[in-house]
Amino acid sequence: DNTELASNMWLWYNFLRTGRIDIWRMAEAMTRHTGEVDVYHIGPNAGLGSRHNVSHWGCGAKEARISQAAWNRFYYYLTTDERCGDLMTEVKDADHKLYDLDPMRLAQPRSEYPCTAPARLRIGPDWLAYAGNWMTEWERTGNTAYRDKIIAGMKSIAVLPNRLFTGPKALGFDPSTGIITTECDPKLETTNHLMTIMGGFEIANEMMRMIDIPEWKDAWLDHAARYKKKAWELSHSRFRVSHLMAYAAYHLRNTQMAEEAWKDLFTRLEHTPAPPFRITTILPPEVPSPL
């Protein structure tokens, strides 16, 4: 799946919980494949990855969420594999590709969404992927320039008109400073389920343990607590992203919210089709043996 739904992460977290060697082997294979094969290492797209492909590199969306260092951190820190370390170094300045390649050029063209910033991105999955790259470079080398870039982003997001709900999805960004801006209607709001299902949630939570920016923490907690309701209000989104509400419930010590998050894992949202969770046995001659 080219890391599209954070499969590397859930494999590694599963290994850390269980210690199972079969999970280790799968996580290792995924890490090596997605880090070495699904990412461009030379050429105009170097530092980015390609997703949604039937064949490799077929998708026009060359994005940081595929190449981000977050996928490789587990394997590197558990093995000190230097090749893996090189792959993380490769992407430390991948945000500079935004000068030439706008991830929202088709979905939200500049002609329709005013922006005089030198580049554009989404808070997630784009900025969170870049921030994970910077966090990794900072912790591996001690280069505080990358830490400062994260801080600039956190502080600028915290003062946006609607913080993490600020619309449109494509916001102004300056790769030289790390500052995020908007020039659109300050009343415009948006939600994006992709923000926190592609490694962004885990990276943000780890960053907040390393960098204490109260206004960012407040913005992140507010987004987690209100995401489900806001997503339904704005677009009738069926993606509830239950871990956001669970996170908010824990930090707010809100039992009712915790119960709702747990319930959401097993029930469907009103007005949406029920998930087709059915177990079907397929028998020969359709398959060689029962499946």
Feature map (PLM): residue ranges:
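Catalytic cores of extracellular degradative/oxidative enzymes
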Residues: 1-279, 284-285
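Blade-level signature of beta-propeller repeat domains, shared across WD40, Kelch, NHL, RCC1
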Residues: 290-291
